[in-house]
Each structure stands twice: as structure tokens, then as C-alpha cells.
Regions:
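Short acidic/glycine-rich loops and adjacent helix/strand connectors
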Residues: 1-182
């Protein structure tokens, strides 16, 4: 099964292809950071405009890097929040257009929960990885460490820094979160 992930919750545009729920085949990111620097932070309007300009190229690069064709994608996953409204709309609209035009199911996902799930993906890494490094990171051959449920998950992501109790991957309880917005 091939899943296309699209992420546009803030100032970056990203697309990735994951095989069988865990193996990352590609991950392409386009950042608009240089356009925001002179303002001292992310400007939502600039972020969404840059995403409109780059999202097609990011998708094409992710599909090509994964070595698959768009028609081989079985599911499209897209960030639906939290995030900047304009940026989220770019990603969701783009994902829905692909979903409808090619008849591929669409799954909207919570950006913060995705940080928890990302811990269990098998990352791309060079063929020559020292054994000690593999063991330190919890990798065994082609598999990343699986979760032992339940567990506590910590996500440190700006104004959305949170501590979660993960009963299973469909039951996540927020134990605490930051009160600031940055």
C-alpha cells in the first residue's frame, strides 16, 4: 500500500510517499523561510502564496523520488489542523483535487498527532550506517522500533507543545499543553 502524505500547516510545503504504513520512500520539503526572515517571523499570507507556487513541484518530486506513479497511490493523507488557515486550505484543496480526480481515498490528519506517529516510521538512511548508531536509534534491520501500548508521547512544536497518553493509536488523551502561541 502506498500513502501520499501532504503537509502545509505552516510555512513549509511537504509531500512524502510511505509504503505499507512505515517505510518512507520519499520526503520532499520546500521552505519559504527566506521570504519571512525580513519580517522576523512567519507571515501567513506569504506562506500560503509560496505553497500555491510550490506544491505541484513538491508533489512531482516526491512521486518521482519514491519510484511510483500517482495512479499507484492507494491513500492520500493531508494535514487538516492545527495550523495557519490559508496554508491548511492550500494542502487540503490540493489533496482533495487529486483524490476526486483519481478516485483515491482521502484521510485528513491532525498535525500534532502525526508527530507521535512519525516516531514509528522507518526513515530513509544511507546504506552504510554504523551498527552502534542503528542500535542506539532502535533500528533492527529494516524495521524501526514498535510502540508498546500504552505510552506517553511528548510533542515539542511551538505553541502546540503537548504531553499525551496514547492508549492506542485511535485513543489519544492530552495530559497537558503549553498556553503560549509560539
Amino acid at each position: 500500500m502506498y500513502v501520499l502524505g501532504i503537509e502545509t500547516s505552516c510555512d513549509e510545503t511537504s509531500a512524502a510517499v510511505v509504503k505499507n504504513g512505515r517505510k518512507i520512500l520519499s520526503c520532499v520539503v520546500s521552505s519559504s523561510l527566506k521570504f519571512h526572515k525580513k519580517y522576523g517571523g512567519v507571515v501567513p499570507e506569504i506562506a500560503s502564496r509560496m505553497q500555491l507556487e510550490t506544491i505541484t513541484q513538491v508533489l512531482d518530486s516526491a512521486i518521482k523520488e519514491a519510484g511510483v506513479e500517482l495512479k499507484e497511490i492507494d491513500l492520500i493523507s493531508v494535514t487538516s489542523g492545527p495550523g495557519l488557515l490559508g496554508s491548511l486550505l492550500v494542502g487540503i484543496s490540493f489533496a482533495k483535487a487529486i483524490s476526486i480526480s483519481l478516485g483515491i481515498p482521502l484521510l485528513e490528519v491532525n498535525h500534532i498527532y502525526s508527530h507521535i506517529y512519525a516516531s514509528f516510521l522507518q526513515p530513509q538512511r544511507p546504506q552504510k550506517v554504523r551498527k552502534e548508531r542503528e542500535e542506539f536509534c532502535g533500528f533492527r534491520g529494516d524495521l524501526a522500533t514498535f510502540a508498546v501500548l500504552p505510552f506517553i508521547g511528548l510533542v515539542v512544536s511551538g505553541g502546540h507543545t503537548s504531553l499525551f497518553y496514547v492508549r492506542d493509536f485511535k485513543k489519544i488523551e492530552t495530559l497537558g499543553q503549553t498556553l503560549d502561541d509560539a
